UniProtKB/Swiss-Prot annotation:
Protein name: Methylthioribose kinase
Annotated family: Belongs to the methylthioribose kinase family.
Pfam family membership, one: APH
InterPro entries recorded: Aminoglycoside_PTrfase, Kinase-like_dom_sf, Methylthioribose_kinase
Disulfide bonds listed in the record: none
Pathway the protein takes part in: Amino-acid biosynthesis; L-methionine biosynthesis via salvage pathway; S-methyl-5-thio-alpha-D-ribose 1-phosphate from S-methyl-5'-thioadenosine (hydrolase route): step 2/2
Reactions mediated catalytically: 5-(methylsulfanyl)-D-ribose + ATP = 5-(methylsulfanyl)-alpha-D-ribose 1-phosphate + ADP + H(+)
GO MF terms held by the record: ATP binding; S-methyl-5-thioribose kinase activity
EC assignment: 2.7.1.100
Binding site for ATP: N38, K53, E107, D108, L109, D242, P243, E244
One of the GO BP terms on file: L-methionine salvage from methylthioadenosine
Subunit structure: Homodimer.
């Protein structure tokens, strides 16, 4: 039959045909997706529920003028299964994948909240940083040359060649926000800050280097889009979702993106409410280092993991990259194509513009920063130096 786009009606038919519900079951189905690239259906018969996710052959955020390969759904399904091999507690269960229809049937996580929404609403997730730090350490270590035999790594790397979505990252994170491109989207009040950004040749040279790292450093399997909208949370659980951007890339990329999105939330808060975000930034890194170090010592398969002075160099490189990638993410989420609710939902326009100017300034500082040691306090320090006072909604 070939590919066709599901509707709420045909999603139920699909689920019944594939044995997820009885033929006579009264299944309620709603399209709940709020992302840019897919349909997401929740199906519930009152006894059990599932999620059906279907990749569209174009970007929803733009329309059919921006075609995309539906093979990204297979990438996403395989990435979730790889993650589950090492950290099953931090990802949803994948029940099945249909490559022809680009459909993946996965666990319903409705008991949890999208982390971005929860943070905006003031919810607290005390284990978020512990879980994300451990998730990243395990996935990055075990899919790298340090935790995987080189032959196996090369085969796995070939599985995650993801040209369409990598091109989106190349353009929307590293290129378009730093020049005159039609994809950019920002208020006129930001024009002066944007002009200064675009004319900063030192900054653009640094961005070029980070883009080159993304293009060439195939260090480990990365999620590729690890923002707070790609994580479900509760006070006791954390689940990473939506790895359709998964590819082999730099160790520091996911760490930087996650930290940047915590910083964006911090920018939306009054000063006295920001401490929890810096707690999570700092604990994410400390749990990452602790877990990665244990794996390096106990599970390392590469000969030079026995050299004690090698690990600190690797961790320093990861940190340096994470700082720069975080800066790029801050700027793209402020003036690029895909904005974030953390800033967009600040109701007072003057305050919202102020927060966006601060995001641009902080992003520039992070990109330009020359880190000589992996001091996670750097994010708090640069934030305090760049941002004065609190945000008043």
């Amino acid at each position: 039959m070939g590919y066709y786009s599901l509707t709420e009606v045909t999603a139920v038919q699909y689920a019944k045909e594939h044995g997820y519900f009885e033929k006579k079951a009264n299944v309620v189905c709603h399209e709940i997706g709020d992302g840019n690239l897919n349909y997401v259906f929740k199906l519930d018969d009152g006894v059990k529920s599932i999620i059906i996710k279907q990749a569209l052959p174009y970007a929803k955020v733009v329309g059919e003028s921006w075609p995309l390969s539906i093979k990204r759904a297979t990438i996403e399904s395989k990435a979730l299964q790889i993650f589950a091999k090492y950290v099953p507690e931090y990802v949803p269960v994948v029940y099945s994948h249909d490559e022809e229809l680009a459909v993946t049937v996965i666990e319903d996580l409705s008991r949890l909240t999208i982390t971005r929404k929860g943070l905006i609403d003031g919810e607290e997730y005390p284990l978020l940083s512990q879980h994300i730090g451990r998730f990243l350490a395990n996935v990055l270590f075990y899919t790298s040359d340090f935790g995987l035999q080189s032959e196996e790594k090369r085969v796995l790397e070939g599985t995650f060649v993801n040209p369409d979505l990598c091109k989106i990252t190349e353009d929307l994170v590293f290129t378009d926000p730093f020049g005159h491109y039609d994809t950019n989207d920002y208020e006129s009040e930001l024009q002066l800050a944007v002009d200064e950004l675009w004319s900063d040749k030192i900054l653009k040279l640094k961005v070029a280097q980070y883009k080159y790292k993304f293009l060439t450093r195939k260090e480990a399997l990365i999620h590729g889009d690890l923002h707070t909208g790609s994580i479900f949370s509760s006070p006791s659980e954390t689940k990473v979702i939506d790895p359709e951007f998964a590819t082999y890339g730099p160790f520091g990329f996911d760490i930087g993106q996650f930290i940047a999105n915590l910083l964006l939330n911090a920018l939306s808060r009054e000063e006295e409410q920001r401490g929890v975000l810096f707690f999570h930034i700092e604990k994410t890194w400390s749990y990452f280092v602790e877990t990665f170090t244990k794996l390096w010592i106990g599970e390392g398969v590469e000969a030079y993991t026995k050299e004690k002075q090698w690990l600190p160099i690797i961790l320093q490189n990861i940190f340096t990259d994470a700082v720069g990638f975080a800066g790029c993410e801050l700027i793209r989420r402020t003036i690029g194509l895909a904005h974030v609710a953390d800033l967009e939902e600040i109701t007072n326009k003057e305050t919202r513009i102020q927060a966006k100017k601060q995001a641009i300034s902080l992003g520039k500082e992070l990109i330009k920063y020359e880190s000589k040691n992996a001091d996670i306090q750097l994010f708090r320090t640069l934030f305090q130096q760049t941002v004065s006072g609190g945000i008043k909604a």
